[in-house]
Amino acid sequence: MKKLFFAVALALVSVAGSAQGLKANMDQSVKPGDDFWQYAVGGWLKANPLDKQHAQNGAFTDLEELNKKRINELIMMYADKKDLPQGSDGQKIGALYRLYMDSVGRNKRGYEPILPYLKQVRALKTREEVLKLMYEFDNLGFNTAPFGMGISLNPFKSSEVMMGVGHGGASLAQEYYSEPNESQQKVVEAIKSLNKDYLKMVGYNDAEAERMMQAEWAIEHKIGVKTLNQVAQRNPMLTIHIMTWEQLLKDFKGIDWVTYRDVMGYPTDIDTVNVSQLEPLHVVEDILANTSIDDLKAYMELHVIKAFSGYLSDTFTDRQFEAQKIISGVQEQKPRWKRAVNEISGSLGETVGKLYVKDYFPETSKQRVYRLVKDLQQAFEDRLKENTWMSEETKAKALEKLHAMYINVGYPDKWEDMEKFIDIRENENLIENAIRIGQEVRKATLRKYWRKPIDKTMMGCTPQTVNAFYNPMFNSINFPAAILQPPFFDPESDYASNYGAIGVVIGHEMSHGFDDQGCQFDKDGNLKNWWTAEDKTKYNERTKVLADWFSEQEAVPGLKVNGQKTLGENIGDNGGLKIAYRAYENRMKQEPLKKVEDFTPAQRFYLAYARVWASNATPEYIADCVNSDVHSPHRIRVSAALPMIDTWYDAFGIKKGDKMFVPAEQRAHVW
């Protein structure tokens, strides 16, 4: 049954992404040079309206839904088996599924699972008691301390780990606290309203809940307004402040680091730390010293509720969804089984991932995609060697970095096996299990990585993730199995379409190694300048063209893209398109293709690219993307990216007078 479902699902998606389905996806009443988005995917947009469960649809959503069905089938193999050995993969999956799906039990308990913790907060009398419990609850995963510590990589020697230190407390980006625009303010109000209702759900009257909500928000606002904005956070040098442990104790005396370290179970031999941002951490010191005890208790109570609200009764999850309706525009909550799949795939991601690739991503697929990645790598090398604006010195360093990139396809070469320490107990509730999982994973992480060399071949994501990633400190590109299927990668389509879809994704991730952030890391993943001053100036001039261009793009009426915030992703698309097209040209020399449905291979390349991003979305979702995401909205990743690409003009005969035409001298040429 499982294999049959797979074959049918694959065939259905394949039709949409194949060359034979091109015209069905299109709106040929529109000229490609006037509105390529509508021309390329207008038919698809009309045929695929949003359903109530999604704020955005499209290729990513389709694959995520397909994955949920597949993973659910895997889970069902263990859902009713209660006699499996404790600690076995099947026992963990089945037990966690049953705990999550027990709506009767969860609704009967209400907020009882967190009541003992709330009572502890309510009983606090002194500041010393508040801080002590704040640290202890942080160890349980309640995020009650407005700061934190955790194992991280040394940015200047990325094969070594160190302790990272930073502020907490701010759930939103800095812009939401400083000068929020209209759509950001709606998000703020939705969150504050949700927080107030949470407090009423645990027994407070309206006036008490209002006071406590405002107290918690005041603390969050004090921290959030002093954090770096989203553009500034893209500069690694602004988020790196390495100091000794002794210096941390001296510079931030308002935080009891030794007690916090010991409560959290971190090593006692910490010698250096990296503080991500200094100013907000000083704000935290002031908050801990000068905020009233009642307000600190309000902050803690709300964080106890919020940390695991998704594991409580339907009253909590339904109210949480009401806030999400305002934030994203989604109309209907996903059924419980889909939420269970998300929970299990998140908590037991590698355990599920092993089962997933066994059924849905054979070794032959891994090798086929790996060869495709190597083709793209060769195309990037060709373009770098032909680069006319870089000096030979910098070009040599760029080529070294490209050749040193580690490639992960489908699933990791070596599994991390961090989940073998996880113990799921059905005689405990979801929150008790979640607390123990968090603690066990933290301990296992320390055992595996503290004072030990880092294995940079690790993938850092699960095979069932529908996405792709570049890791600058590993200098690795990662393509999980779940994205390596139609319409991204289709074995039934010709290579022109595949290069325009998954080829651009691959080139995009490679380009991240040379975007405004990635270009600051060397071939070994260390933060180190490898540019001549003149070349870096030229680079900045070229990327500014891209940033300025995207800043002109209006996502929804009255709200434009921030070209500086999205620069890295836009460099990725710009480079990915050019690299993938070069790989397509290289292949054409060996295996020429003919027209299909009157479309040339070059046209099919760009139509496939547009198909990948085809999506309908609510205005709220698009606004949220512009406000809080480093990616441009899907439509703009087509309509603004392609006018920067010379070969797109050639493929469709686009010329001066067409609405999307940009003069050649005004186009961005980076990679």
Model-identified regions with their sequence ranges:
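Intrinsically disordered, low-complexity linker/terminal regions across diverse proteins
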Residues: 251-254, 274-278, 302, 334, ...
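Short N-terminal segments immediately surrounding and downstream of signal-peptide cleavage
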Residues: 20-35
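Short, solvent-exposed loop/turn and secondary-structure capping segments
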Residues: 23, 47-51, 174-176, 227-228, ...
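Short, glycine/acidic-rich hinge or "gate" loops at secondary-structure transitions
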Residues: 54, 83-92, 205-215, 231-238, ...
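Active-site-surrounding "flap" and adjacent substrate/cofactor-binding loops of secreted or lumenal enzymes
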Residues: 31-34, 39-108
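Noncatalytic, helix-rich "gating/capping" subdomain that lines the substrate-entry/channel surface
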Residues: 78-371, 375
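Bacterial Sec-dependent N-terminal signal peptides
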Residues: 1-20
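Short secondary-structure subsegments characteristic of cysteine-rich extracellular domains
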Residues: 53-75, 207-226, 498-504, 602-606
